[in-house]
């Protein structure tokens, strides 16, 4: 008998994933399922697969698999959607929950109106590492490497529309300085504490948004004196607000979480 697996497709600022409650629907070989289901013509279509599970360290756990089957350390947009999922599907009544991820325990604050989660604030912790990167003659810009539990390469440019992201994104993702590959962000200051950003995600390619990438971009902007400690990051799929708390050193990310549809696939 064929097993049916129920899923929910959700997105955070356009960064869309397939969500499965593995306490009800265990998934074998999630790497393969992520590849199969993420295909737009023959699968569901998404940036990847996120598994929600139990944890002995937190209220819930989250595992993230990119569209190419690789497992990610963290997904900021995905964590917001997990918060919406567990609240609206009755897995918790709490409006502040903890989430066990490969990059540590994250604290989520749910903004609820009329029984629905309208936004989620995620305490992303402190940036783990920052470093200037100079490519010499190979690329005509300087970048900043920022780790938010996963690696990011942030580059500020005068005109983001002039960046050929499909061409340069994979070159930088796989550049020899980054043996584990890297996420790639290009950003432009468009107003006071307002930044336009586009992303090439490691393992997924161009996506509509990247939460950890938005955090990394805000960190780089502060370090270079381009923005204050609280700013809006405008991405292709939507906007998130990032605050780098001076007192704690933590990054707070606030943004939307949206359900697209429910469905079921063969296991």
UniProtKB/Swiss-Prot annotation:
Pathway: Amino-acid biosynthesis; L-lysine biosynthesis via DAP pathway; DL-2,6-diaminopimelate from LL-2,6-diaminopimelate: step 1/1
EC numbers on record: 5.1.1.7
GO molecular function, one term: diaminopimelate epimerase activity
Site location (Could be important to modulate the pK values of the two catalytic cysteine residues): 152, 201
UniProt key word Cytoplasm: yes
Top EC group: isomerase
Keywords, sorted A to Z: Amino-acid biosynthesis, Cytoplasm, Isomerase, Lysine biosynthesis
Chain residues that bind substrate: 15, 66, 76-77, 150, 183, 201-202, 211-212
Superkingdom: Bacteria
Keyword Ubl conjugation among record annotations: no
Residues annotated as the enzyme's active site: 75 (proton donor), 210 (proton acceptor)
Compartmental location: Cytoplasm
One GO-annotated biological process of the protein: lysine biosynthetic process via diaminopimelate
A GO CC annotation given for this chain: cytosol
Reaction it catalyzes: (2S,6S)-2,6-diaminopimelate = meso-2,6-diaminopimelate
Pfam families: DAP_epimerase
Function per UniProt: Catalyzes the stereoinversion of LL-2,6-diaminopimelate (L,L-DAP) to meso-diaminopimelate (meso-DAP), a precursor of L-lysine and an essential component of the bacterial peptidoglycan.
Family: Belongs to the diaminopimelate epimerase family.
Subunit field text: Homodimer.
Protein known as: Diaminopimelate epimerase
């Amino acid at each position: 008998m064929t097993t049916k697996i129920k899923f929910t497709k959700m997105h955070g600022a356009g960064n869309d994933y397939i969500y499965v409650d593995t306490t009800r629907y265990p998934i074998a070989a999630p790497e393969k399922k992520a590849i199969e289901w993420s295909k737009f013509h023959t699968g569901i279509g998404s940036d990847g697969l996120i598994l929600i599970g139990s944890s002995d360290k937190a209220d819930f756990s989250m595992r993230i698999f990119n569209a190419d089957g690789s497992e990610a350390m963290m997904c900021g947009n995905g964590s917001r959607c997990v918060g919406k999922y567990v609240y609206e599907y009755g897995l918790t009544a709490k409006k502040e929950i903890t989430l066990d991820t490969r990059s540590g325990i994250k604290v989520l604050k749910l903004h609820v109106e009329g029984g629905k989660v309208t936004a989620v604030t995620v305490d992303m912790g402190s940036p783990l590492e920052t470093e200037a990167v100079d490519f010499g003659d190979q690329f005509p810009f300087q970048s900043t490497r920022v780790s938010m539990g996963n690696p990011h390469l942030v580059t500020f440019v005068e005109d983001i529309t002039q960046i050929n992201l499909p061409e340069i994104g994979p070159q930088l993702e796989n550049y020899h300085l980054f043996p584990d590959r890297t996420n790639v962000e290009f950003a432009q200051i468009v107003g006071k504490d307002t930044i336009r950003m586009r992303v090439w995600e490691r393992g997924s390619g161009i996506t509509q948004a990247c939460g950890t990438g938005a955090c990394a971009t805000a960190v780089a902007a502060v370090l270079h004196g381009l923005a204050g400690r609280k700013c809006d990051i405008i991405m292709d799929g939507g906007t998130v607000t990032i605050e780098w708390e001076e007192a704690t050193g933590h990054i707070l990310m606030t943004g939307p979480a949206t359900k697209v549809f429910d469905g079921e696939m063969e296991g």
